Amino acid sequence: MDKNFRVNTNDERNIWLSTAVNENLTMASSSSQPQPISSPFHQPENQVNRVNPGSHYYDLETLESSFGGLSFNDSSVGQNGDSIHLPRRTNQVFTGSSSGGAGDDNGYLLPPMGSHHHRELEELQRHNYLNQLRMSYQNDYAHQSYWYNTDGDGNGMLNNGFLNDVPSSSRDRVSDYYTNRFGYEGYNYWRGNEGFDYNQCQASFSAFAKDKEMSERLGMSIFQGTKETVDAIYNGLIGDICELMVDPYGSDVVQLLMRRCSSEQIVQLVDIVTQQMFQFVNICIDSLGTNAIQVLLTCINERAKDQIPRIVDVVRTVALQLSKSNHAIFVILACFRLFPLHCRLLLELIVQNCHQIAIDQHGCCLLQLCFNKDRVPNLEIRQRLIMEAIANALRLCLNCYGNYVVQYIVELNNRYLIDALVRQLIGNYAHLARNKYGSHAVQKLLKLRWIDSRVIVIDLLREIDTLLLDPFGNYVIQTAWFVSKDDVRRMLRYHIERNIPMMRCNKFGNKVLEKLNI
């Protein structure tokens, strides 16, 4: 067969055609006079074969008529390279309306009614119709062309079915993508033409919750469903609740579910989540899991208050681990915000380890958030933590993270707290000014307009000779110059002019002279 001659058909048609060819070969071999088999694809120009049911040419004519409904790459080229002229036809579906081998209006010759080939053709039509209907349902699912009501009313099935203009290749992609996606038999209940059956799908709820599309539908069922619906979903998810809390899609489903849970179900959730401490910590330090735990704390505060001491004690046990995570610190904050009367032991633990927490990258953020009244409304908790930070101010100012805690206290603009901080650091300002991190805290204190900067400047003058030449201290002296007035500035000028010869030989000293125009 010529390489340019290619049949573009489906596997079902190939089966029917191969059957016809085999029967034709059998009849030809049983004939009394052997003769070569004629090719059904080659027809001399202007030649018309009459249909004679009594000869083997009838089967050849039938086979040729069936191929007339197929498309070819080049219909003008025969097997032997000869040109043939056939009527221009497009792919059409056999209707079976003609009978007895008579041709229809388009020149098709169909098998006679009741013949073996006619039964094959009817079966092919039925198979193609069911296959098209199945792909139509799958296309509806892919484009969300359905509506669903969790209360039981509504059709719960796919309604679109408009696939007449969709290419076969597009339909196949839809079918391939959505076929047995998770390997769960229950998954088909979400895509079928029947309503959602919770009993049948209960074993696959976890798989649904982890899928993007299915989790949205599951969340809508939780949000709009009845108590029986919520209970069914709860029973299907409770076994994998810890895993779902840290899942990209399952976490949202769990949070919606917890907001609909009863007090007994909340208690059961607490039992499971706190059963193993390392698992609880892993959930808290996860970016998604921490949100789920915070929702659980909110639900405990609303519907299971008897569980408050228990959950706070669990958080206290692992508080130091949680304070070192940028996600888990919000669990501690949630306890301070929701359960201020039950957090005495937790507060004492944070206070006792204030320095250790403050010099941690994420612990310093925890303390700053605890100082914020919007985050921790309870004044007693805030004051206790702030005063403990002030007591450790000197060591904190020298740390790359701890100095941010001290600076945040300054930014609170509370005179009582700032006066306490200034007094706490007296005698150490020169030492802090020579430190990379401490110099920032000293400069921030000097810039406060409503405090008496004289106390800080006098402390700096004790070591002015070294500060003028120090990589960090020179910036503190420049700040002190601009914020000081009258007699304090005159004292600074005196010491600066006294050190001009030495400052001229040092790049940091020159910076001071250039900045002050001296």
Curated annotation (Swiss-Prot):
GO CC, one annotated term: nucleus
Pfam families registered for this protein in UniProt: PUF (PF00806)
GO terms of molecular function: RNA binding
Primary localization class, coarse: cytoplasm
Positions of the PUM-HD domain: 178-518
Localization, UniProt: Cytoplasm; Nucleus
Chain positions covered by the region annotation Disordered: 26-46, 77-114
SMART domains, sorted: Pumilio (SM00025)
PROSITE patterns to which the protein is assigned, alphabetical: PUM, PUM_HD
Pumilio repeat locations: 206-235, 236-271, 275-313, 314-348, 349-387, 388-423, 424-459, 460-494
Gene3D superfamilies tied to this protein: Leucine-rich Repeat Variant
Keyword Cytoplasm: yes
GO biological process, one term: regulation of translation
Record remark: domains: The pumilio repeats mediate the association with RNA by packing together to form a right-handed superhelix that approximates a half donut. The number as well as the specific sequence of the repeats determine the specificity for target mRNAs.
Described function: Sequence-specific RNA-binding protein that regulates translation and mRNA stability by binding the 3'-UTR of target mRNAs.
Name of this chain's protein: Pumilio homolog 14
Organism: Arabidopsis thaliana
